[in-house]
Amino acid sequence: VARANSANEQIVRSTMRVMIDELSVGKESPAGRWMGVNGLFDGQPADSVAFLTLGQFRGAESAKESELVRIVYTREGDLLLRFVRKNLYGLTDESIERVELARKVKGFNVRYYDGKTNLWLDEWNGAVRGVPKAMLLELMLQQENEELQTIRQWVTVGAP
């Protein structure tokens, strides 16, 4: 059981690293603002965050608006999901890719650091606030017959 839990934790940590990589190069654009929604499901955090980032992690210098993708991370039931819209101007669901990032999720909490007010916030409106300076992601998982496990990751957004 310990080996399986260790393997699960490694998978979750690598998933969180991908999320951190995408969030760290997040962009602000009229094509899509940062948006963070504070949610609950079964009394536990079920937040959602939507943002623009560079497709395939291209260098910031070469990024054109057409290379940006819209990403949404959200908890639905016991799943952590990632939605990607590669065509920002596409109107059909065909331009949306859905990926299951984690199972047995009991909570997904996102906090946003506003560098202008020096406050941590539970929700984010990019139309008013722009891009958050930093974020805290908390993913709570419950494996079979195990205690609730919380994995936390900090990320600086828009870092050079």
List each model region and its residues.
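Short linear sequence signals and composition-biased patches located at protein termini or domain-edge surfaces
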Residues: 106-160
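Local beta-strand/beta-hairpin segments that build beta-sheet-rich folds
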Residues: 80, 97-106
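Well-ordered beta-strand positions in beta-sheet-rich domains
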Residues: 70-72, 98-99, 150-154
